[in-house]
């Protein structure tokens, strides 16, 4: 008779550990895209783990193309309808995000639900209404909030190229982030430093936490 009993620990070694959902948030031009790429490279090349980067809004989808036209000042739209479009853009990615995570791929994301809520609430839309649209989406495991004054962000290259890149509006967004969204589970990163200093801090946090997060279940936004 063939012995099919597995040795203790063998099943754990062969089981695929889930991927991590890592998110970068912050006002415009604080360096999110740069740090997304840096951490993606670190996870892939140093930790040797499968990794994919995403960005919201995803402007490649039909919904994303409508959003892009708005952001480029090509169209106008009711603010509540626009918020629902942004939220729908995240919902249409839900299944692919969960599939990647369950198959062991780490996802590093530039903006997500919190950004959508902050921007819409900064226009005066009810915060709770904005957030309700996001409930049920996959919840990030690690959130890096890149902190920089709105004034300093305006000094960076290409600032002002899109509809929302206005100083007073960015100040409102920052206030909503820090008063209603950022909590003790977010990693607040001082973005007024060199790219390498920021990258090293973020990579160090990931390295110290990813193994324990792999053993947890994927949560939902509530």
UniProtKB/Swiss-Prot annotation:
Key words, A-Z: ATP-binding, Kinase, Nucleotide biosynthesis, Nucleotide-binding, Transferase
GO molecular function, one term: ATP binding
TM region positions: none
InterPro entries: P-loop_NTPase (IPR027417), Thymidylate_kin-like_dom (IPR039430), Thymidylate_kin_CS (IPR018095), Thymidylate_kinase (IPR018094)
GO CC annotations on file: cytoplasm; mitochondrion; nucleus
Top-level EC class as recorded in UniProt: transferase
Alphabetical list of PROSITE patterns matching this protein: THYMIDYLATE_KINASE
Cofactor(s) the protein needs: Mg(2+)
Residues that coordinate or bind ATP: 29-34, 111
Annotated Gene3D superfamilies: P-loop containing nucleotide triphosphate hydrolases
UniProt-listed GO biological process terms: dTDP biosynthetic process; dTTP biosynthetic process; dUDP biosynthetic process
Pfam entry (one): Thymidylate_kin
Catalysed reaction equations from the record: dTMP + ATP = dTDP + ADP
Region annotation (LID) ranges: 146-170
EC number assigned by the record: 2.7.4.9
Pathway: Pyrimidine metabolism; dTTP biosynthesis
Oligomer and partners: Homodimer.
HAMAP family registered for this protein in UniProt: Thymidylate_kinase
Function (record text): Catalyzes the phosphorylation of thymidine monophosphate (dTMP) to thymidine diphosphate (dTDP), the immediate precursor for the DNA building block dTTP, with ATP as the preferred phosphoryl donor in the presence of Mg(2+).
Similarity annotation: Belongs to the thymidylate kinase family.
Name this polypeptide is given: Thymidylate kinase
Organism, as annotated: Dictyostelium discoideum (Social amoeba)
């Amino acid at each position: 008779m063939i012995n099919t009993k597995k040795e203790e620990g063998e099943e754990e070694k062969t089981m695929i550990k889930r991927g991590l959902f890592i998110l970068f948030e912050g006002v415009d031009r604080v360096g999110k895209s740069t740090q997304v790429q840096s951490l993606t490279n670190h996870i892939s090349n140093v930790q040797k783990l499968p990794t994919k980067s995403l960005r919201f809004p995803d402007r490649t989808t039909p919904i994303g193309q409508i959003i892009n036209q708005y952001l480029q000042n090509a169209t106008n739209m009711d603010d509540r309808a626009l918020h629902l479009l942004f939220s729908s853009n995240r919902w249409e990615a839900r299944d692919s995000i969960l599939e990647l995570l369950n198959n062991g791929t780490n996802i590093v994301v530039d903006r997500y639900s919190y950004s959508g809520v902050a921007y819409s609430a900064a226009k005066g839309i009810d915060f709770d209404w904005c957030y309700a649209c996001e409930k049920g989406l996959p919840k990030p495991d690690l959130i890096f909030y890149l902190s920089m004054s709105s004034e300093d962000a305006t000094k960076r290259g290409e600032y002002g190229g899109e509809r929302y890149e206005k100083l007073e509006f960015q100040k409102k967004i920052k206030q909503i982030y820090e008063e209603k969204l950022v909590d003790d589970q977010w990693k607040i990163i001082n973005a007024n430093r060199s790219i390498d200093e920021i990258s090293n801090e973020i990579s160090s946090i990931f390295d110290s936490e990813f193994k324990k997060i792999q053993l947890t279940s994927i949560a939902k936004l509530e």
